[in-house]
């Protein structure tokens, strides 16, 4: 009887304790980089590279390069390139400088993901490109931050950004400094940069840094043909015209 009573008392104690009678679970601590956003993996194959175009729609894209505006050259070239990208490749589009604000802060946060990274997306990207006006500033760093933290559909697999800009950062930030910090904990992003007729040395150096630090490529494109070739090389598509490619490893 004593043994039976002891067993019953033991079970009652377990119930009253709410399970705390068992060994305590170990405590784990972890930390994540500032502003980093976790997104769960999707069911689709995560081994393929995701590609995000970031295109400059600042007011200076309305300037002429030869007989056409830089914006017209960029749009017509993108139309050709998008038709060459396989449908199974996940691509997306972010733009900046497409709107102005009443304050510098508003102008320096003028960047939007207008077409999320996904497969079979070429037509939608081109449609969005042709619906946007070039009117604002050049918040490159803000655009890169948004792209790195929010624009890719999951946290696995390789991610590539192709940045097309006709000028350097004109907000109070440094794309080079941001990328150096980002690469301390992110090794999954590569950035190719195409400088569209940029004559300013400091601006070029900032953009070269972005490519170099991420093991990407930097291109100088001063004509429509060179822009097309730069995009083809970046995307590993068949090249037709030899452009000017800068080796960032020198």
Residue ranges and their predicted role:
Residues 9-18:
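Bacterial N-terminal signal peptides
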Residues 70-87, 93:
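An active-site-proximal "capping" alpha-helix that borders the catalytic cofactor pocket
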Residues 24-26:
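Bacterial signal peptide processing site
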Residues 37-39, 49-55, 65-72, 100-192, ...:
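Exposed acidic/Ser/Thr-rich ligand/metal-binding surfaces
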Residues 60-61:
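Methionine-biased hydrophobic packing positions in alpha-helices, especially
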